[in-house]
A protein has these predicted regions:
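N-terminal, post-signal-peptide region of Sec/Tat-exported proteins
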Residues: 45-76
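Conserved short C-terminal alpha-helix that flanks the catalytic cleft of nucleotide-sugar-dependent
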Residues: 63, 163-164
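Cys-dependent condensing catalytic cores that perform Claisen condensation/acyl-transfer
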Residues: 231
Length: 259
């Protein structure tokens, strides 16, 4: 599948001028939801049909479960997530003062596990980490994204933007080639969106499971036949931060559904 998408991407860019449109102005930015077909939108809108909600329910159970050497649950510190976590995911990645760098929501969950629960970190893309992340992010559904506002984040946002604009891989393509210049077209039968990460972690029909934004970014990098960054790498965190800051003002949708 990745091979054929790479071929399709190369074909698309041979007939379409690259990097002519420039960055999408804020007033023209749209969630990927608006590019979806009616069946996909209906699946996302109905919580009883949205498969991502199964992960949210798992995350709710994990929220109240004591773990680690401290024998503490998330709820012991944060109480009712419906109030304490409302708006939190809309701010992430956020700046961590002790680390002097931004951290993603997944990384924050693992930092909390280490610092307050004395528990081992959950592996990236593990069901438990995705479930907790989905549960926390779900509390912000409908809340406008505000990520990237802190002054300390400015150089990291700039780093993410540079990565988004940078050509790479054997196909010599940048993220911007597809998502700034060619959105609203199709690639290998799927709609090209603006890459506004409003609903992560989201349920991707191709994956048949929930996945993080980092998984999606790694897939795109592999698609242009470049070496994917490691999960949790500074590059992926910077890209996620830039994309979330670029989506400021759009409402959170977690768990979104995409093809």
């Amino acid at each position: 599948m990745i091979f054929w998408r790479a071929i399709a991407a190369a074909a698309l860019l041979t007939v379409t001028p690259a990097l002519l449109a420039g960055e999408i102005p804020p007033e023209a930015r749209r969630s990927g939801y608006s590019f979806m077909g009616s069946e996909t939108r209906a699946m996302q809108d109905d919580d009883t049909s949205n498969p991502g909600m199964l992960f949210v329910l798992d995350g709710e159970a994990l929220w109240g479960r004591k773990t680690g050497g401290a024998d503490k649950s998330c709820a012991d510190c944060h109480g009712d997530a419906r109030t304490s976590m409302k708006g939190v995911a809309a701010r992430y990645p956020a700046f961590d003062k002790p680390l002097s760098r931004p951290v993603t929501l997944d990384q924050r969950i693992n930092l909390c596990r280490a610092d307050h629960q004395q528990a081992a970190p959950l592996p990236y893309e593990s069901r438990d980490l995705l479930a907790l992340s989905a549960f926390v992010a779900h509390q912000s559904r409908g809340v406008a994204i505000t990520a990237g506002d802190a002054p300390e984040l400015k150089p990291f946002v700039a780093q993410g933007r540079d990565l988004f604009m940078q050509r790479e891989g054997q196909l010599n393509l940048a993220c911007a080639n597809c998502h700034d210049d060619n959105f609203d077209k199709r690639l290998a039968g799927a709609p090209i969106t603006q890459a506004q990460p409003t609903g992560y972690p989201l349920y991707r029909l191709e994956w048949q499971t929930l996945g993080s934004l980092e998984r999606r970014l790694r897939s795109c990098v592999t698609g242009v036949r470049a070496q994917a960054f490691d999960y949790g790498s500074p590059e992926l965190v910077a890209l996620e931060l830039y994309l979330m800051s670029r989506a400021r003002g759009l409402p959170m949708e977690t768990p979104a559904v995409r093809p």
